[in-house]
Design a protein with these regions (language model features):
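Flexible, surface-exposed loop regions and adjacent strand-edge segments
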Residues: 87, 97-103, 148-154, 203-205, ...
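Transmembrane beta-strands of outer-membrane beta-barrel pores
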Residues: 21-23, 35-37, 55-61, 71-73, ...
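Short loop/turn motifs that connect adjacent beta-strands in outer-membrane beta-barrel proteins
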Residues: 2-11, 39-48, 74-79, 127-128, ...
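Outer-membrane beta-barrel proteins
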Residues: 28, 42, 78, 89-95, ...
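C-terminal beta-signal and terminal closure region of outer-membrane beta-barrel proteins
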Residues: 294-316
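C-terminal outer-membrane beta-barrel translocator/porin domains of Gram-negative envelope proteins
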Residues: 163-168, 172-272, 277-280, 287-288
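Residues on the lipid-exposed face of transmembrane beta-strands in outer-membrane beta-barrel proteins
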Residues: 17-19, 31-35, 67-71, 117-123, ...
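Gram-negative/organellar outer-membrane beta-barrel architecture
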Residues: 5-14, 20-155, 159, 254-257, ...
């Protein structure tokens, strides 16, 4: 049974795949292969490390392949976090800024290919507190623009190499599907011209989450996220709203600018065996700079969904 943790196995591995439908990618077939392992099997307090291979194809020509994971060294003294992926997607673009995103007449087609490699290595300074360097490589290629004027003269293809520093406080009980604890991470990223970047910019990203059991099978989860970029930020690396984790239902990238901010509160309820449900409410906005944040541009978000736990403490 993939939903039972196999502590006697050095590497607990499971695979799940199936059809899906969304308004963006239409009908598709997704696959996730997830593994859990412990670097010190005698340490019951050390959370398991994890690795996932994920892929997707759909009827509109979308394809995705990637691998991500968190490797926790013995005694949790160090952490290696990584995410590598590439995808191709017939996408939509509205331009930069709130007004462009809110204007439905700006909707334009283009083809997008993107690849990213992101790695960080964290050193533990104190209980639950880590610091370490990170490196990011991005390649973004846009083609066949329906309305090229919306790109405002920016290059369709960009290659970007970044170095940075991460600060982390993490008291979650489980990295992939927490039921209690705090998570706070600050990433400071630098993309200078001397690394070969055509667009020199920097960014500051803050992600914080809180998890609290409320009753049997129920977990209250709160999240706040902001991404601020400075300098000559390329279109493909601007802050955006919309993902499978926050501001769900908004087309990812419709609202994009040099800064974005969103918050969400979610109630998760285990129902039966692997099945669960969730309801959430949140809000988000974008802005060219933090000083130009305006409440009238805040977008609401709310809904409910189904949660499937195909592996113990790993949701699909």
């Amino acid at each position: 049974d993939a939903n039972k943790e196999k502590k006697n196995k050095k590497f607990d591995f499971s695979v799940i795949g199936g059809p899906h439908y969304s308004s963006d990618t239409k009908f598709g077939l997704g696959l996730v292969a997830a593994g859990l392992y412990r670097t010190d099997r005698n340490d019951s307090l050390l959370p398991p490390s994890n690795v996932s291979l994920y892929g997707d194809v759909s009827t509109v020509g979308f394809y995705l392949l990637g691998v991500r994971g968190n490797h926790l060294f013995p005694q949790d003294k160090y952490r290696l976090n990584y995410n590598l992926y590439f995808y191709s997607f017939p996408s939509l673009y509205w331009g930069r800024g709130y007004d462009n995103g809110a204007n439905s007449d700006n909707e334009s087609d283009y083809k997008r290919f993107q690849a990213q490699v992101k790695v960080d290595f964290m050193f533990r300074l104190a209980k639950n507190f880590y610091i370490g360097p990170m490196a990011i490589f991005d390649y973004i290629d846009g083609r066949d623009f329906d309305k090229p004027e919306l790109w405002e003269g920016m290059a369709a293809r960009t290659t970007n190499t970044s170095l940075g520093l991460s600060l982390l406080y993490d008291s979650r009980d489980f990295l992939t599907n927490a039921s209690h604890g705090y998570y706070l991470r600050i990433d400071q990223r630098f993309s200078p011209a001397f690394l070969g970047n055509k667009y020199a910019f920097s960014s500051t990203e803050l992600t914080t989450s809180y998890y609290q059991p409320v009753w049997k099978g129920g977990v209250l989860a709160g999240q706040f996220h902001t991404l601020l970029t400075y300098g000559d930020t390329p279109w493909g690396l601007m802050a955006t709203l919309g993902s499978s984790y926050s501001m769900r239902g908004y087309y990812e990238g419709r609202y994009r600018d040099k800064g974005a901010m969103d918050a969400q509160i979610e109630l998760r309820q285990h129902v039966w065996k692997r099945n669960g449900v969730a309801v959430w409410a949140g809000a988000g906005t974008i802005f060219p700079r933090l000083s130009e944040f305006t409440p009238k541009h805040i977008l609401p978000n709310y809904g409910f969904g189904y949660r499937w736990e195909f592996k113990k403490r790993v949701r699909s």
